[in-house]
Amino acid sequence: MADPVSVIEIWGGEPLSGHIPVSGAKNSALVVLGGTLLCSQTCRIRNIPDLMDIGRMTNVLEALGLKVTRDGSMLDVDGSHVSHSKAPYDIVSKLRASFFVIGPLLARLGVARVPLPGGCAIGARPGELHIRGLQALGAHVHMDHGVVHAYVPGARGKLKGAK
């Protein structure tokens, strides 16, 4: 016999209907926010949780020249004026997800300078996997005094597909 606590029985024979709001997922939202660097127009993103890490990522984007406006759980991110390729240490040091801006900066500007990220220190999570991925796409990447310097060589300065 099953434990009565682990069983849910529904009686009544009536169809169920309705809506259950689901909160946004922070880690997914951080990746999407980094991806807004690829857009030269305004991106509207819905169901974004109002959390400290989301605020830090929007601060990183604003420091790079994007304009971010929040209305409840919706963010408008205007990427028409990306003006910097270097993310500021004082913000990046508090957020591991800030590493997600390197690829979009390389794709958009051909260059990125991002300090090694900080944030939640649950185990060692070096950026080596990201760096190898960027190198596979044709970027030249090196570290200097805790800052990842990446650029795309050549006159066109575009990333290429990996094999």
Where in the sequence are the language-model features?
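Structural preference for solvent-exposed beta-strand-turn elements
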Residues: 1-163
